[in-house]
């Protein structure tokens, strides 16, 4: 997987996480949109991902985050961003917690590390 393909998978994972509790808030949509710009993804590449990902629930789960060519520090930073997005509104729903745990495990982050991130970001 190339780094550009990986960036699109990361955006898809954020969209899946946003939909975990059945709806995407404006704050989550803004968070993901800002992230796409920050990641320096070409507009023509990420716009279709965002339009599809934010307009309806994903058809398939993101299962290949481990294949993205990023180092350990970047993996931790990515999961911290997942957690930060989940905490934008009322808190972490059970559905979001399940998706978050699955995505974090793909990136080599265990439950203890994930809980430490959540506490640090609260």
Language-model features: where?
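Small-residue-enriched hydrophobic alpha-helices in membranes
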Residues: 1-122
């Amino acid at each position: 997987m190339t780094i550009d393909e990986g960036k699109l998978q990361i955006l898809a994972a954020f969209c899946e996480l946003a939909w975990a509790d059945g709806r995407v808030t404006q704050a989550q949509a803004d968070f993901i949109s800002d992230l796409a710009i920050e990641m320096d993804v070409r507009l023509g590449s990420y716009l279709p991902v965002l339009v599809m990902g934010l307009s309806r629930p994903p058809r398939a789960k993101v299962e290949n985050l481990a294949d993205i060519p990023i180092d350990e520090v970047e993996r931790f930073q990515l999961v911290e961003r997942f957690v930060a997005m989940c905490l934008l509104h009322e808190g972490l729903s059970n559905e979001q917690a399940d998706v978050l745990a699955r995505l974090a495990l793909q990136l080599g982050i265990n439950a203890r590390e994930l809980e430490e991130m959540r506490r640090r970001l609260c």
